Structure formats: C-alpha cells, structure tokens
Amino acid sequence: MFNDTALEAELDVAGYQFSSANSINIGRLIPQVAYYVYAYAKLYKNGAIAKDEKINVVVPTGNFGNILAAFYAKNMGLPIAKLICASNENKVLYDFFSTGTYDRNRDFILTSSPSMDILISSNLERLIYRIAGNDAEKNTKMMEELSTDGKYAITDEMRAQLADFYGNYTSEEETAKTIKKLYEDTGYIIDTHTAVAAGVYDKYKKDTGDTETKTVIASTASPFKFTRSVMDAIDPKYDAMGDFELVDLSLIHISEPTRLRCIS
C-alpha cells in the first residue's frame, strides 16, 4: 500500500496519510492477525488443505509481535497446530521456550537479520499476561524483575500452556547456507530474516519428525532490503559489487520494489 501512489494521492486529498507503527504498538499487531487468516484461506482455496485441517506457522522474530498475532489468530479459532518461533543468534526467545527463564543478561550480537537483534522482547509481555491467567499483578511483577534483575522465570503451570510453541535459532553461518541452498535448489531468493525461519523449520522437522503438516513461513522482508548479505551468502564473488549493482543482477527473479527501481 505504501507504494501505491494513486491511493496515496487519494488519501492526501482527504487529509490522510499512511504511517507505520513500531511492533510494540497494538495497532500494528492486531492487523497482522489477518496475515494468517488470509494464508489459511488461500491454502484452502488452492486445495492444499482440507476444511479445518491444521497448519504450522513459522515466524522469524525478535520482538515477538508477528508470532503473537499468529497466536491470537489461533485463539480466535484459526486451525494452527504449532507456532514455530525462529530466532537468530540473539536467541533470548529460544532460551525462554527451552528453559522457562527469560534472561537478557548476555552479549548483544549484530547479525545479518537486524530486525531480530533484540534482547528485550516487548511483545512477550502480552503472552505472559495470557499464560498467567490474565493476572496483571503477576505479569507486572515479572516485568519489574526483568527491569531490575534482567530476567524472570515463569512457573511450571505457565510453561505447560506453551505446548503449542516450538522455539529454535540459526547461526549466521546456517542462515547464509539456507539462502544459498534454496537459491541453488529452486532459483528463489529469500532475505536473511526469512532464511532464519526456513532454517529453524528444517530443525523443527528433524526434532519432531513432523514433515506432513502443511506449514506457512512468514517472509517478513524483501531480499532487496538486504542485498549485500543475501548475495554474499549465494556467492562471495559478489562482495566487490556496489549495492545498486547487486539490485540489478538478473539472477534475482523477482520484481524490485517500484520506488527502488526509480532510484536505481
């Protein structure tokens, strides 16, 4: 919508303009619920799934917003089996799902998936509230512990309510290998964040043996936004090329965004 100049002009006449909200803003999170409803409806329309058949959802996340939207969709009745939380090397969410303890007391790592470089996952508070039985006092206490001690732990009873979640992470090396392998196998190029999700999904299948459930991977960014990291992963020979040269490479078999095309 942000690239639709006709719609932008129409809104301008009416005195409105589009804006974007940070992922902590509930105004951004709630519309994301529609992503998963739409994806499910499209799978059903295309005959990929039967009516009421459950699917898995994989989301690359640092701030826990997009995957929380999937959680809300599931709670609203969308047939979702597993919510697969994919982290990069800043794996605070993976550790939380593995141990029940959220601990931000660790080194911050700069990765090729910068939108996920987060140690305080603000939207997780909303999930904690739900699994705490909507107990605002208990939720507040844990957030205060995070603020003062840098960590908090949930109870066994709360952990039991996370059975539908699976968490894992990929290293920088694994992320690059995922990009390269997918391109070599299919000719399709994904960005670094989507590669984290794809890599974690591979680990999920190995860990669980669940290879039959239809699965949606949320591709949260365009490879054109991270051309340097993406092309370095495919072949180091591209390292000497400029960013605009990388965008123009014919091996990227998807259309570049309109406004980027105008710049280049």
Residue positions per predicted region:
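Active-site-adjacent helical/loop segments in soluble small-molecule enzymes
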Residues: 3-7, 12-46, 51-54, 130-208
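Structural alpha-beta junctions
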Residues: 9-13, 78-80, 237-240
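Structural motif
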Residues: 15-19, 55-56, 81-84, 187, ...
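Glycine-rich phosphate/pyrophosphate-binding loop at beta-loop-alpha junctions
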Residues: 48-51, 56-145, 218-234
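Extended hydrophobic-aromatic, low-complexity segments
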Residues: 192, 208-213, 226-229
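Small/polar glycine-rich anion-binding or flexible loop at a beta-alpha turn
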Residues: 194-202, 219-225, 247-250
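A hydrophobic, small-residue-rich beta->alpha segment in the mid-to-C-terminal subdomain
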Residues: 230-251
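Single conserved hydrophobic/aromatic residue that forms the stacking wall/gate
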Residues: 252-263
